[in-house]
Swiss-Prot record:
Keywords: Ribonucleoprotein, Ribosomal protein, RNA-binding, rRNA-binding, tRNA-binding. It comes from Alteromonas mediterranea (strain DSM 17117 / CIP 110805 / LMG 28347 / Deep ecotype). SUPFAM superfamilies: Ribosomal protein L16p/L10e. It holds the Pfam family Ribosomal_L16. Belongs to the universal ribosomal protein uL16 family. This is Large ribosomal subunit protein uL16. It comes from the Bacteria.
Amino acid sequence: MLQPKRMKFRKMHKGRNRGFAAGSTVAFGTYGLKAVGRGRMTARQIEAARRAMTRHVKRQGKIWIRVFPDKPITEKPLEVRQGKGKGNVEYWVCQIQPGRVLYEMEGVPENLAREAFELAAAKLPFKTTFVTRTVM
C-alpha cells in the first residue's frame, strides 16, 4: 500500500478539505477518472480501485495513479480513556477536492476503459466521472 517513506512530523492536525483541485486535467493517458465530490481516499481504497481496473483490462495498456496518500490519520485504541496524547497513526489518506483526476489509462478501447473506471468508482467514497484527454 502507498504511504510516504519518511515525513518531517509523524502526526498531523485534522484540517479542512475546502477549495478546488489541482491536477484537474488528463495529463498522461487518454482517459481519466475524475472526482465530482469531495472526501478522502485511503491507501486501501486507492489499491482496491487499481486492482479492479487492472483485472478488468487484463493487464493491457497503462494505468497511472494521480493521487498519493500523504496525510496520516490517528486513532486511539478501543476502551481507552481520553487524554494521554494523540493516538497512533493507523492509516494514510489523500484529501480529494472536486475536479481532481484520480486515475488515467491509455492503450485500451474507450468502452473497456469506461467499464474499468466504473468498477473502480464503486470502490470509492465519492462520486466520479469519466473524462477524455482534450487536445489543444
